[in-house]
């Protein structure tokens, strides 16, 4: 496997647990990453291994949403998400994989070639050979570039942010904007803040300006420790999901496969989920079955998010949704649960229809009181 982040490490753990001897190539993990660090309720409930992490998990039952015009509402969920630094999460998963019997080669892979039924994996130090290759090497995947070509530029989003400290106790905050399809965030971690902005398209100059304005407006007194920038898969063409992610001798998982929610940008759940399905396909000696497995399990959710992204980020809809959440406890909880990946995109309309009567009554009652 090329890549020792959540997808690669979890796959290594699962395969080693079943007696295989997987090898992970990664020269940099575990490390802090440009990532908010939010662990969704979906991930917490689905992947029990996460509960074994000895590190303190910052529980988060509340999220403040801010509309493009500045209207805000604090939503509360019935279940809590977690906030962890990626250094802690990635180290935990990689350590578990190694403990289970996975081998870590701390060398940077610079090229892969398939010759005479073997993969030649070239690092900066030497060349290795393998019969089967997994690309878990993120958005800029070398494995993907060699097999399918890179993720198209139009399907890449950009993120920019910082790690900072504050004397104030901050809440989890998400801020939407008038003219970008994305949002700014603040995730309070155990001993620092992760603050950033992600958008589906745009240039570095624009995202830095919006980020700096966000800091000036909401966090003027923080102490910035470091800044970062990164790309993220934000798929805009639903036909992207028609591409194969596996064949007889290779597989792509996590960000390398483009498996990130196109609306929320959440990728950890799908990194772990894709690893779980990949392990099943490999263990039954049918790696190509991974193509149908991931589409059946979460493909509809990613595709629905992709096709409804423009609708979701309509400024008028965002304004109305946050106003509605301020007047309806049911809709407020719905907004929280969707953000925490409790409600998949494909079930959004069904869930709203189910609760529409209750939401309407709460809205009318609240409006009359005010």
Predicted regions, residues:
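Glycine-rich FAD pyrophosphate-binding loop
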Residues: 2-4, 11-35
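Predominantly flavin-linked oxidoreductase catalytic cores and closely associated redox partners
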Residues: 4, 14, 18, 96-226, ...
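Generic enzyme active-site microenvironment
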Residues: 24, 135, 253
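A short, flexible beta-alpha/helix-coil linker loop
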Residues: 30, 71-72, 193, 257-260
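A conserved beta-strand/loop capping segment in the N-terminal third of enzymes
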Residues: 39-92
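FAD/FMN-dependent oxidoreductases across multiple families
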Residues: 111, 203-281, 288-289
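C-terminal helical "tail/cap" subdomain of flavin- and related membrane-associated enzymes
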Residues: 280-370
């Amino acid at each position: 496997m090329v890549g020792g982040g959540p997808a690669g490490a979890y796959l290594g753990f699962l395969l080693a647990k079943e007696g295989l001897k997987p090898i992970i190539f990664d020269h940099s993990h575990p490390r802090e990453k440009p990532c908010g660090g939010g662990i969704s309720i979906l991930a917490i409930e689905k992947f029990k291994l996460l509960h074994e992490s000895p590190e303190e998990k910052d529980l988060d039952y509340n999220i403040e949403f801010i509309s493009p015009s500045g209207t805000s509402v604090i939503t509360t969920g019935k279940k809590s998400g977690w906030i962890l630094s990626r250094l802690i999460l990635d180290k935990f998963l990689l350590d578990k994989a190694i403990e289970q019997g996975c081998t870590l080669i701390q060398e940077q892979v610079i090229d892969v070639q398939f010759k005479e039924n073997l993969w030649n994996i070239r690092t900066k130090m030497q060349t290795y050979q393998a019969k089967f290759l997994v690309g878990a090497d993120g958005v800029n995947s070398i494995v993907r570039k060699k097999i399918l070509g890179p993720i198209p530029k139009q399907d890449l989003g950009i993120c920019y942010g910082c790690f900072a400290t504050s004397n104030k106790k901050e809440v989890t905050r998400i801020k939407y904007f008038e003219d970008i399809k994305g949002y700014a965030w603040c995730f309070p971690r155990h001993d620092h803040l992760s603050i950033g902005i992600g958008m589906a398209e745009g240039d570095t100059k624009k995202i830095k300006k919006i980020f700096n304005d966000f800091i000036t407006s909401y966090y003027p007194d923080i102490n910035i420790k470091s800044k970062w920038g990164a790309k993220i898969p934000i798929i805009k063409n639903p036909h992207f999901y028609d591409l194969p992610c596996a064949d007889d001798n290779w597989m792509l998982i996590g960000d390398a496969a483009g498996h990130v929610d196109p609306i929320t940008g959440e990728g950890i759940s799908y990194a772990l989920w894709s690893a779980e399905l990949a392990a099943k396909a490999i263990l039954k000696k049918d790696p190509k079955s991974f193509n149908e497995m991931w589409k059946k399990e979460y493909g509809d959710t990613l595709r629905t998010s992709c096709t409804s992204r423009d609708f979701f980020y309509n400024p008028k809809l965002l304004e109305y949704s946050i106003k509605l959440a301020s007047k309806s406890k049911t809709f407020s909880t719905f907004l929280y649960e969707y953000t925490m990946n409790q409600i998949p995109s494909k079930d959004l309309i069904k869930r709203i229809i189910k609760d529409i009567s209750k939401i309407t009554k709460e809205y009318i009652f609240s409006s009359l009181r005010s």
